[in-house]
Amino acid sequence: MHCLIAAMLVVGLGQASGFQEIACPEIYGGHLQGIATDNEQNIYWSFTVALVKTNRAGELLKTVPAPTHQGDLTWVDGKVYVAVNLGKFNQEPGQADSWVYVYDARDLTLLEKRAVPELVHGAGGMAFHDGKFIVVGGLPEGYTENYAYEYDRNLDFVQRHVINSGYTKMGIQTACWFDGAWWFGCYENEKGLLKTDEQFNLLGRFTPNYSVGIAPWTDGNCLRGVTVPLENKQHRGAAVVDLPGKASETAAK
């Protein structure tokens, strides 16, 4: 959710060797924040200050500017939902300004803005499953757990869930429901992908970290977002066809 050193950002592409890769066309301000897919395998790419739609081959369909700082996103029933923080990340309560922006998936027209003040450390990512949205975000140093905030289909707050993951750098960046579990991408270089059950009990930690995008794909696979920094704070993005959870560390007892 914040600027990262180049080595952390390009690590995904280094691990992509041998995997099918879908490139997002053009370059954008800020790094890739998240990816989402719809029922037709169109791909929605969230960069820090841009929202992009491509087809499954990576051909550009639409791009629109976005507020800084836009985060991870999800597609639900013809709409794209994006976690947005207009304030500060990773601070104690009172400094974030957390929102969910809702776009028409057809042409990326902005339809609605919904405040989510419960994300007190900054809204940075979101996913949808079983009639509910889960929004995740930043985390100040010194905390020993992460949080997942549950909202109903109307984006009304339901409850906060605790993930006993220990501290992860800047909290959780991306979220996805896949293969009967929640997956959460963090900026940790090692074991930065968290897997939980439906009740958010930690099941394991995995490498690579999926911190700039995770979304369901075809044939039982996922897309893993990767990003490459260029000059003048510009970035390219891509998605690698991959499968999360191949290398793990035993979950805490």
Predicted regions and their residues:
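Beta-strand-rich domains and repeat architectures in extracellular enzymes and scaffolds
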Residues: 22-49, 69-72
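Surface loop/turn motifs at the tips and blade-to-blade linkers of beta-strand repeat domains
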Residues: 23-29, 63-66, 114-120, 161-168, ...
